[in-house]
């Protein structure tokens, strides 16, 4: 908060020292109440408290046509509160709406024009936004993509001279071919879905949608038959459920390639995801709400809004969004219950959260395997390993012996047995998992680490760890494991090399820093060792057992050193 206040004082100084700023030559013409509300709005806006920011901005509307920075913050706050139409009206009614000084203002006006099917006006606003295309790396991509889209919507053909943005261009090509009903639409979606350079599984939904829209039901069924509920995303699980239940009309209710607004909406959703992946929650929600404005039918996309609010600690807002997912959307309803349980855990602790989820789970008739899987994971995370094993076993018994999903479930159940100290069953599950998938680095790591801790089959454990590290050399947990393995066989120089890398990869992990302290002690670097042990005590994630052991080590050092 102190830093925010300092930032505000700097802003105030700039306002009063600069002779010409924005549309207002001086702040003397504004009364103190307007300025107070405006600057309170800035503080709230900077602190990500958008609801309060909007209240303060609403109370200082006199600045609307006199100060550009106010217009930007006010319109942003409106969009973030999902008042997109109001934000558009504010911009349209500003005294100089053809000389706006921020890119997103023109995006709002373009969205308004698209909603009104006024493609010429949308193109005009897009051209005006050209001045901002180099402000950041996304603006140019957005500008060029919208230019291609508008050309296609107007002329019913694709633009010949267009920029190539790699995989984003492949996505755009698939949607534009779908819009134009091109014969090669199918191959475009398949090329996208099977692209080895990333996870494009979301677009399986749009491929299924395309097949159903063109009455190719059997092909749509063939696609969903290849999907597994456990390993599929929310959207694909819901899609499979609709196809399995012959609810084909549900697809057209939320998206159509024939609707240009739906296509632009999906592009904006992609941009929202890109911002979310960079932890820019504000920009992510801005583009997501703009996406929802263009296609309000696709309410399933709101799961990202809920997730963003949850990650930002805005739990009341998250719960409000989650409430739209009712039992009609089976998998999104379950997502809602899980997220509500996670919020309860944050507020009241794990026990109350798991009790809430268990009570909701008990009311679900014939829960599918994905729901059972999630419940098992909740129990495992809450250290109720007996219950976790019970639910993992229910799913494992129904799966084919060679299923990769079975391999993952055996890994999870084996880990639960290991935590209970039932090493025989743990080893059986973990070795069976490796029989199905011998190159799973995480199973190799888990089994090998367990053996090392038990002083069991040390040479074989080292071989497995070396294989795991070769497969995942930048994974901090695997790096820590192989470093700790060298520690256990008293090769402290090699151990230090790996654990140091693990600390660099995961600097706030209590176990890794504790391990590094132990190794430094063995290397007679005692002052540094105590530094890392003390650092672990300051970490919120350090459990009481680690803290207890470290307090002893700080005083006595490592025994038998």
Language model features: what each stretch is:
Residues 54, 58, 84-97, 119-133, ...:
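Alpha-helical repeat scaffolds
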Residues 70-71, 105, 139, 169, ...:
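TPR alpha-solenoid repeat register
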Residues 73, 108, 146, 172, ...:
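Canonical tetratricopeptide repeat
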Residues 255-265, 510, 515, 522-561:
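Terminal, low-structured helical/coil segments at or just beyond the last alpha-helical repeat
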Residues 42, 76, 111, 149, ...:
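Residue-level recognition of tetratricopeptide repeat
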Residues 46, 80, 115, 153, ...:
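Register position in tetratricopeptide repeats
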Residues 17-74, 80, 88-89, 100-101, ...:
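N-terminal leader/linker segments that initiate helical-solenoid repeat arrays
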Residues 65, 99-100, 134, 164, ...:
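Short coil turns that delineate tetratricopeptide repeat
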């Amino acid at each position: 908060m102190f830093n925010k206040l300092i930032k505000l004082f700097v802003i105030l100084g700039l306002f009063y020292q600069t002779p010409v700023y924005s549309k207002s030559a001086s702040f003397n013409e504004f009364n103190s109440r307007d300025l107070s509300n405006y600057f309170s709005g800035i503080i709230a806006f900077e602190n990500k408290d958008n609801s309060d920011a909007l209240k303060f901005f609403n109370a200082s509307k006199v600045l609307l046509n006199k100060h550009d920075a106010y217009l930007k913050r006010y319109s942003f706050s409106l969009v973030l509160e999902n008042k997109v139409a109001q934000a558009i009206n504010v911009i349209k009614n500003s005294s100089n709406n053809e000389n706006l000084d921020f890119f997103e203002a023109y995006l709002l006006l373009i969205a308004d024009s698209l909603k009104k099917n006024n493609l010429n006006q949308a193109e005009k606003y897009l051209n005006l936004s050209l001045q901002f295309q180099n402000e950041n790396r996304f603006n140019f991509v957005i500008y060029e993509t919208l230019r291609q889209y508008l050309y296609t919507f107007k002329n019913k053909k694709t633009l010949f001279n267009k920029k190539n943005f790699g995989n984003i261009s492949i996505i755009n090509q698939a949607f534009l071919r779908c819009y134009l009903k091109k014969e090669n639409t199918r191959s475009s979606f398949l090329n996208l879905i099977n692209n080895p350079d990333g996870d494009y599984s979301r677009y399986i939904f749009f491929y299924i949608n395309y097949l159903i829209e063109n009455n190719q039901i059997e092909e749509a069924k063939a696609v969903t038959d290849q999907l597994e509920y456990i390993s599929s995303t929310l959207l694909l699980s819901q899609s499979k459920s609709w196809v399995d239940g012959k609810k084909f009309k549900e697809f057209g209710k939320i998206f159509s390639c024939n609707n240009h607004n739906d296509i632009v909406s999906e592009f904006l959703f992609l941009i929202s995801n890109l911002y979310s992946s960079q932890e820019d929650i504000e920009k992510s929600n801005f583009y997501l709400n703009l996406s929802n404005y263009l296609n309000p039918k696709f309410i399933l996309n709101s799961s990202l809004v809920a997730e963003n609010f949850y990650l930002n600690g805005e739990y009341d807002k998250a719960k409000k969004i989650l409430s739209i997912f009712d039992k009609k959307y089976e998998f999104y309803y379950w997502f809602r219950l899980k997220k509500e349980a996670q919020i309860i855990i944050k507020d009241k602790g794990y026990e109350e959260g798991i009790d809430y989820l268990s009570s909701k789970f008990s009311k679900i008739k014939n829960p599918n395997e994905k729901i059972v899987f999630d419940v098992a994971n909740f129990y495992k995370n809450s250290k109720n390993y007996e219950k976790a094993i019970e639910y993992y076993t229910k799913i494992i018994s129904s799966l084919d012996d060679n299923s990769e999903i079975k391999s993952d479930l055996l890994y999870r159940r084996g880990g639960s047995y290991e935590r209970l100290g039932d090493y025989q069953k743990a080893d059986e599950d973990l070795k069976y998992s490796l029989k199905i998938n011998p190159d799973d680095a995480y199973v190799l790591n888990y089994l090998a680490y367990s053996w090392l801790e038990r002083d069991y089959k040390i040479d074989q454990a080292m071989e497995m760890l070396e294989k795991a590290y070769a497969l995942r050399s930048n994974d901090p947990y695997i790096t820590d494991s192989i470093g700790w393995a060298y520690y256990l066989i008293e090769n402290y120089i090699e151990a230090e090399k790996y654990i140091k890398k693990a600390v660099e990869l995961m600097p706030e992990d209590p176990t890794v820093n504790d391990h590094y302290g132990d190794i430094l002690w063995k290397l007679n670097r005692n002052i540094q060792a105590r530094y890392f042990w003390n650092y672990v005590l300051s970490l919120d994630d350090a459990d009481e057992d680690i803290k207890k052991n470290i307090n002893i080590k700080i005083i006595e050092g490592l025994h038998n050193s």
